[in-house]
């Protein structure tokens, strides 16, 4: 399955406009948010918002202030179109989690769904801490390495997804603790997703005239998911500021 990739995995997600492109999807997001104290006064940052599926849900469900940030212009354009069609008063911002365009201490909750791995973790994690209010909460869903892989296999996966590295649960925990988060809890999920429930269906916002190469990337992603299903897992990291 050797591909001469002109595009990245994240380019592929943007072109297909995949919403909820993280383990557990919107179903997991709803579960996590339902545990937090959220009302109209809560300020939430959806960091790496993608096409805005999560942001739109939060704004509708909780009627609170939501800020949606993504570095990918195409993703953000699709998010804006979504918010416009729903008449959602969500603030959008193009920018990097490694250098957030916000002053410090302004968010109660930061939601980061399969985002940190695609960045320089040593920059993103301290930035999240900086913009959180005292006692604010970071909810991060991240890929973890469940079993060791050969150097070659690891390199193949890292290069394909464009992630900086693939970390174990303990390595993630250490990084959050080093950033001086007061409390770091880790949770493993075994979600039973009801495929027949229309709300759990993958959300797409397709671009026109999609290059064949994007379908090849999607196919390779499905291949990796199958081959490495026992090796690549995910965790929720809940970090209190």
Spans of features found by a protein language model:
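A short SAM/SAH-binding and catalytic strip from SAM-dependent methyltransferases
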Residues: 109-121
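A short acidic, Gly/Pro-enriched loop at the edge of an enzyme's catalytic core
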Residues: 98-109
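A short glycine-rich, Lys/Arg-flanked "PGG" loop and its adjoining helix->strand segment in the class I
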Residues: 122-137
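Conserved alpha-helix/loop element of class I SAM-dependent methyltransferases that forms part
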Residues: 22-40
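Conserved Class I S-adenosyl-L-methionine
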Residues: 185-241
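Class I SAM-dependent methyltransferase SAM/SAH-binding core
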Residues: 45-47, 51-99
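Short alpha-helix
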Residues: 164-180
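Short, glycine-/aromatic-enriched active-site segment of Class I SAM-dependent methyltransferases
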Residues: 16, 143-163
